[in-house]
Amino acid sequence: MAFASASNGAVRFTEEQEALVLKSWAIMKDDSANIGHRFFLKIFEVAPSARHLFSFLRNSDVPLEKNPNLKKHAMAVFVMTCEAAAQLRKTGRVTVRDTTIKRLGSTHFKNGVSDTHFEVARFALLETIKDGIPASMWSPEMKNAWGEAYEHLVAAIKEGMKPVALL
């Protein structure tokens, strides 16, 4: 999916897209722990092999549904994703609380995250949001708004995944 970026590198996220993201995030926010957990369960349903990307899951016998480390991580990632999306238009760029995009990029690079993984996560995120809001709210425009926001976040993470050239 293509996304718009102004010539100065600022993100263009329309007022309508922002309104859709903010409205749906307001509904999901209070249940973000459970919705975030469902997001990751959907990722592992679509791509079971993605478990190896998470050090806290590699040698764990705890079922995904009950794994406290997964629940904690899933909530943090879901909240970060939604908050970054909600601020996209206001800030004109991807902003992330408690960490930096460069660190996220470095972690994703170190763990071998690929374009395919980002696509699986995009699919899982959109399905999770669709299930996390009233059916009457879900629309092609809502899907597009969240998809656009996700693509901006991924682009920022991928920028941080580039190896630093040594001079």
From Swiss-Prot:
Site entry (Homodimerization), positions: 143
**Main subcellular location of this protein, as a coarse class:** cytoplasm
Needed cofactors, names only, are: heme b
- Per the UniProt entry, the Enzyme Commission number(s) are 1.7.2.-
- PROSITE patterns named in the record: GLOBIN (PS01033), PLANT_GLOBIN (PS00208)
One Pfam entry for this protein is: Globin
Report the catalytic activity. Answer: Fe(III)-heme b-[protein] + nitric oxide + H2O = Fe(II)-heme b-[protein] + nitrite + 2 H(+)
**Gene Ontology BP, a term:** cellular response to calcium ion starvation
- Name a GO molecular-function annotation: oxidoreductase activity
Q: How does it assemble?
A: Homodimer.
> What the protein does?
Phytoglobin that reduces nitrite to nitric oxide under anoxic conditions (e.g. during flooding or in waterlogged soil). May not function as an oxygen storage or transport protein. Has an unusually high affinity for O(2) through an hexacoordinate heme iron because of a very low dissociation constant.
Specify the protein name: Anaerobic nitrite reductase NSHB4
